[in-house]
Structures are given as C-alpha cells and as structure tokens.
Amino acid sequence: MDFLQINGGAKLNGKVKISGAKNAALPLIAMSILAGNDIKISNVPNVADIKTLAQLLRNLGASAEFLNENSLKINTNDINSTKATYDIVRKMRASILVLGPLLARFGHCEVSLPGGCAIGARPIDLHLSALEKMGAEIDIKDGYVVCKGKLKGATISFDKITVTGTENIVMAAALAEGKTKIINAAKEPEVVQLCEMINKSGVKIEGIGTDDLTIYGSGGKLLKFSDFSVIPDRIEAGTYLCAGAITKSKITITNANPNHLVSVLAKFNDMGFNFEINDDEITIIPPKTIKPTEIITSEYPGFPTDMQAQFMALACVADGVSVIDERLFENRFMHVSELSRMGADIKLNGHIATINGTHLNAADVMATDLRASSALVLAALVAKGTSRVHRIYHLDRGYENLELKLRNLGADIQRASE
C-alpha cells in the first residue's frame, strides 16, 4: 500500500494550478444519463472517484471515454441496465447521484446503498422521501434501493440542506412531468453549475443560486447538452492556500475562482494572512505570527466542512487557542488523534474542538478520510523531522497529483510503497 514520506520544514514558493472540482464533476457525469447526445466534459480532475463513476456508467451500458487525462466523452444512449452494483458503489458515496436520473429516464432502477468516506451517518433518507413525493415507489432490499414509478413534479421541502439530495432531485425533476419546486435547496457552486448546464439544455430552472429552485420538467424527453468545462475545485484551492499558510510561504494558486472562496479567505485574514487577487490567481502572503481563530462550519456560503480539517492543522501552529465547531457532520474529527501523535494540543467536547497552538513533530500517521488525509499532509509539511502518511488511497479519491504539485512548490515529499 502506498504512503507519503514528508520531510518537514521546507519553505514553499511558486505557482500551483487548481484542478476541476471533483464535487462538481461527479453530478455532471451523472447528468449524462439525461442526455440524448454525446457530452464532452473538460477540466475533469484525474482522481479515483471520477474513474469509479465513469466505470459505473460503463457497467450500465454507456460509453465513457477519457480523451486525455482531464477530458471525458460520454454517451448514454445504449444503457441496458439500471442496476448500480455494490462492488462499484461501495467505493464512493456519490454513486447515489445516478438514482434520480436513472429513475427519471427509465422508470425503474436499483442502486446499492453507498460507501466512501466513513463520516457519520450521512443518510440518504432525504433523497428517497423527495422521490416518493414525485411518485416513486421505493423499497430497501438486500442492501439495494429499489425504485420504480413515473415521476411527476412536486413541491419538495428539505428538512435539512443536502447537496447531493438537491442534485439528485434537480436531475430527476429535469425529466419528470410538470413543475418541481425545491425549498431549502443547497446553494453550493457545484449545485449551481449542474443547474446551469440543465437550464442550457432546454429545461427551464428558476432560482439558480438561491435556496428556492423551480424546475420545469421535459416529460421524459431526453436533453441536449453542449460541451462544457468543470468549475475549479474550491476545496483543493483552500488546501494549497493552507500549505502556503502553514509553512509561512508566499505561493500563488492559479485557475481558481475567488468568488467561491470568500468564507475561507476571510478566515485566513482573521489569522493574519493577506492576499493578492488577480482574476483567477490568488497569492497568499504570510504574517510573522499566525493568529488563532474561531470557525463554525455551515452550508455554502458559510465556512465549508471540507476545509475544517485543513484549518485545524493550521490552528495547531497558531499563536494561541483556536476553536472549531463542526455543525454539519458527526464523527468528522477523526484526524484529531493522528494530529495528536504529531504533538498537537487538541481537546474535544462533542462537536467542538479546542486547539492550543504549539510546535509539531514528525510521526507515522494514518488517514481516515479524504480531507483528514490532507490535514495530515499539511501538518507533516511543518513538523520537525520525517513523517509518513499511510492509507493515502483516501487522498487519491479527491486530489489530483497532490505530491507532484507540492513537490513543484518545493516540498520534500515522496510517494513510496510498503
């Protein structure tokens, strides 16, 4: 199994190009099930989760061909199965995104209950109750969600904001008969891009970018999509800014969208960092002393839960006491025990972490999920000595060429096998 070996203490400098957003690409790939034409998607990140979803489509009978490392051509005209099997779904929670489009197009589907990162319960009940309101009959049988029914427009009010739930229902509503209204919809940039692409395909969507969406379904008519490019990954962008921050290095990220990073940049400002922003480039300028901060995770446009672990690593070396309140997911502090192995001073009380800034020392640590693994890499960049980060298959699910990009910035980092 691969691990990363990192010698801490190197200063970083230079530029790093941000990849396309994994969390935007996944629903856009699932959206191809709604299409009656070939779709070409560019700026697709070359990460494991994307390859998994492309393979899932192939298993259904679609063609999904990588034209190069970051471009994907999909045709779903020859889908001959509507069963997404456990062997592929178990690798990735986002596989549930095929549920809405498969049901809307074919009137039946079976999707294995999802896998992926082990972060709390993350139930899919919200997806299922919404589809039932649209006319679906749903059973959970032998570990599969079994759905059938012709979907009709309905008013869906989510009790809790759900990103994948919003995406699933938007896609289902696109082919449903009549008007669907989604109240308390997610507003993330990844949801916005999905809505924009469907809107351009001829299905009218009102309220894009708000928490109140109205979708006028095509009544089963397949959609025609233009070629498009995936938006930049705001979480990857934030992670590389954290790499510059934790090593007190001036670095520049390119191909980023500063408008998607407002809450993250504000927290960096609180901690004493400044920025130069020029179109799609952001340069982070470190202070002499990193100030502590207080963070509460929330839905977009609030501070993203997917940046919580990285900022915890940064808080570990701040001058003072920081507090992080994780409001969105349970069990999302699994990196704490590993950071503690490196000398971090962190106390947990339920969903609140209190971090007393200190110096970090190298250690062997183990990744438990995607964002936790990036936090351990960040900590290792500044820890004294040589660290090894194990179970980095979590990293490969969501970060494209992480060690190569960090090495190009000057980090002393190598991938090796044990």
From Swiss-Prot:
This is UDP-N-acetylglucosamine 1-carboxyvinyltransferase. Its EC number is 2.5.1.7. GO terms for cellular component: cytoplasm. Its main location: cytoplasm. Pfam families: EPSP_synthase. The gene is murA. Gene3D superfamilies: Enolpyruvate transferase domain. The keyword Cytoplasm applies. Phosphoenolpyruvate binds at residues 22-23.
